[in-house]
């Protein structure tokens, strides 16, 4: 996608944390907010009493003259419409793979759904050419005793025609590699942006900040 630019010259990018329910998306976002000092404003969350995201979590992070609006999606299967709404206009994706072996099918379901919705953006017809929207994977919960091997995750990505996807081994509750993954995704946003500028693409002005609209009853 293409970022927008505010009147003061600030570039605005949108990052989305994707993945199955309870995979660590909100925990990772909370770590960025509470521990890393990158947040500008409050962490907004729409969740149920158990901590499951009902629509999205949102955080604004600012680095120099670049702003990143970071969203998580609701991971439960019934919230497909909400995920599709949050996904619109995304500049980069971070897929949180739940390393718990018992969650294998949920990971596969979530990845397949993402490719159905956004495959034309995150896949490239030529592996030598990066896709329009960068995607990285956080293999989360690496502190658990029974975890899926990284090689198996790589096999899934290869079968999905994403063999060059970068994988970070993370533990969201302790922050292990969370900042590294976030910074990498943010950097990829900026790099893609300047690649597009070289090709002559224009940056649209930023509209007033809006959030995804919740579905009606």
Give each language-model segment a name.
Residues 44-82:
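Switch I (G2) and immediately adjacent beta-strands of P-loop GTPase domains
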Residues 70-72, 94-98, 136-140, 169:
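Conserved beta-strand segments of the P-loop GTPase G domain that flank and frequently precede/overlap
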Residues 143-199:
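Canonical P-loop GTPase G-domain recognition
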Residues 1-46:
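Conserved G1/Walker A P-loop phosphate-binding module
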Residues 89-111, 119, 129-130, 142-147:
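Conserved Switch II/interswitch segment of TRAFAC-class P-loop GTPases
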Residues 22, 76-77, 100-102, 141-145, ...:
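Conserved nucleotide-binding/hydrolysis micro-motifs of P-loop NTPases
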């Amino acid at each position: 996608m293409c970022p927008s630019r505010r009147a003061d010259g600030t570039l605005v990018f949108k990052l989305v944390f994707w993945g199955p329910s309870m995979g660590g998306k909100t925990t990772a976002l909370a770590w960025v907010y509470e521990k890393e000092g990158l947040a500008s404003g409050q962490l907004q969350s729409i969740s149920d009493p158990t901590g499951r995201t009902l629509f999205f979590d949102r955080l604004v992070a600012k680095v120099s003259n670049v702003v990143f609006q970071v969203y998580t999606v609701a991971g439960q299967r019934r919230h497909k419409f909400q995920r599709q709404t949050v996904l619109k206009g995304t500049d980069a994706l971070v897929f949180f793979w739940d390393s718990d072996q018992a969650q294998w099918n949920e990971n596969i379901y979530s990845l397949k759904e993402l490719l159905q919705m956004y495959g034309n953006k995150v896949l490239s017809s030529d592996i030598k050419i990066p896709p329009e929207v960068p995607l990285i994977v956080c293999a989360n919960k690496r502190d658990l005793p029974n975890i899926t091997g990284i090689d198996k995750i790589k096999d899934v990505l290869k079968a999905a025609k994403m063999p060059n996807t970068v994988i970070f081994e993370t533990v969201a509750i302790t922050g292990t590699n969370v900042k590294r993954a976030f910074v990498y995704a943010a950097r990829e946003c900026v790099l893609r942006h300047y690649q597009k500028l070289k090709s002559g693409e224009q940056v649209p002005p930023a509209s007033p900040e809006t959030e995804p609209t919740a579905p009606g009853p």
